[in-house]
A protein has these predicted regions:
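Intrinsically disordered, low-complexity serine/threonine- and proline-rich regulatory segments
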Residues: 1-11, 93
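Short, contiguous hydrophobic alpha-helices characteristic of membrane insertion segments
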Residues: 6-7, 55, 111-112
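N-terminal helix-turn-helix DNA-binding core of bacterial DNA-binding proteins
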Residues: 7-50
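A cross-family signal for key residues in well-ordered alpha-helices
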Residues: 19, 34, 53, 91, ...
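Amphipathic alpha-helical dimerization/coiled-coil segments
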Residues: 22, 87-112
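Basic amphipathic alpha-helical segments that dock to polyanions
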Residues: 51-58
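Beta-hairpin "wing" of winged helix-turn-helix
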Residues: 59-76, 81
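Accessory beta->alpha helical hairpin/"wing" motif in late/C-terminal subdomains of nucleic-acid enzymes
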Residues: 82-86
C-alpha cells in the first residue's frame, strides 16, 4: 500500500515555513515547499495556496525578511529569510508544540 502524506493541521503552515527557513537558509517559496516535503520524507506536503499567504503574514509580522532576486533558472523570485524575531518566535512555538505532543501522548497512553 502506498504511503500518503499527513494532513497539515490548521495553524502549522507558518510554523513549518519558519522552521524550513531557519534550518534551510534563504529560499524562495517553491524551495520552501520542496524543503518541507523532502525533510519530512513526504509526510508533510504543503500546498502553494497555503504557503504563500503564510509567508506574507510572517513577513508582515517582521518574522521574515524578503527580497526579490533572480533564481537559478533565471526568473525573478521572492527570497525569504528568518529575522531574529522569527527565530525567537520559532523557539517559542517549538516549545509549545513539544508540550502539546507530550500532553496528547499522555492522554492517548492513559498516563497520569
Amino acid at each position: 500500500m502506498a504511503r500518503t502524506s499527513l494532513p497539515i493541521l490548521p495553524g502549522t503552515v507558518e510554523f513549518l515555513a519558519l522552521g524550513a527557513l531557519a534550518h534551510g537558509g534563504r529560499m524562495h517559496g517553491f524551495e520552501v515547499l520542496r524543503w518541507i516535503g523532502e525533510t519530512s520524507e513526504g509526510d508533510l506536503l504543503v500546498e502553494e495556496g497555503a504557503l504563500y499567504p503564510a509567508l506574507h503574514r510572517l513577513e508582515k509580522r517582521g518574522l521574515l525578511r524578503a527580497e526579490w532576486a533572480v533564481s537559478e533558472k533565471g526568473r525573478r523570485a521572492k527570497y525569504y529569510q528568518v529575522t531574529p524575531a522569527g527565530r525567537e518566535a520559532l523557539t517559542a512555538e517549538s516549545r509549545q508544540w513539544e508540550r502539546y505532543v507530550a500532553a496528547v501522548g499522555k492522554v492517548v497512553e492513559g498516563e497520569a
